[in-house]
Amino acid sequence: MDSPTILEREFTTFRPPSGEIESVKIFQREDGKWFLRLAVSWKGGIACDVCLYDKPKLKLYSSIVSAVRHVCSTYEYAGRIILFPNRGRPIK
């Protein structure tokens, strides 16, 4: 992981009162799994890879549908989501 990381609890349970998710990018890895990279207002808009709720391990999704659903329902994000599929991998 080249990007800084952020624990999921930092923008769900412990999100600052005026904190906002500024952008969402979803990347596909070589193994076909998907992960999130979010930019949040309280970290100066720096894009961070999302880790598990309480562990610094990358949170992975088996399908793009589950990743998008999680962003929209759990994080209450209603903006643009940019997808970065891995060339040569099927999108599922």
Model-derived regions, located:
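Short, compact, well-ordered microdomains
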Residues: 60-92
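A short linear hydrophobic-aromatic micro-motif
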Residues: 22-25
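Short aromatic-glycine-(Arg/Gly/Cys) micro-motifs in beta-strand/loop hairpins
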Residues: 27-56, 77
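Negatively charged, low-complexity tracts enriched in Asp/Glu with abundant Ser/Thr
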Residues: 1-19
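Short N-terminal micro-motifs specific to bacterial/archaeal maturation
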Residues: 2, 57-58
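Generic preference for well-ordered secondary structure
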Residues: 8-10, 45, 51, 67
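A generic structural signal for short, solvent-exposed coil/turn residues
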Residues: 16-18, 28-30, 73-75
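Phenylalanine-focused residue identity feature
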Residues: 11-14, 27, 35, 84
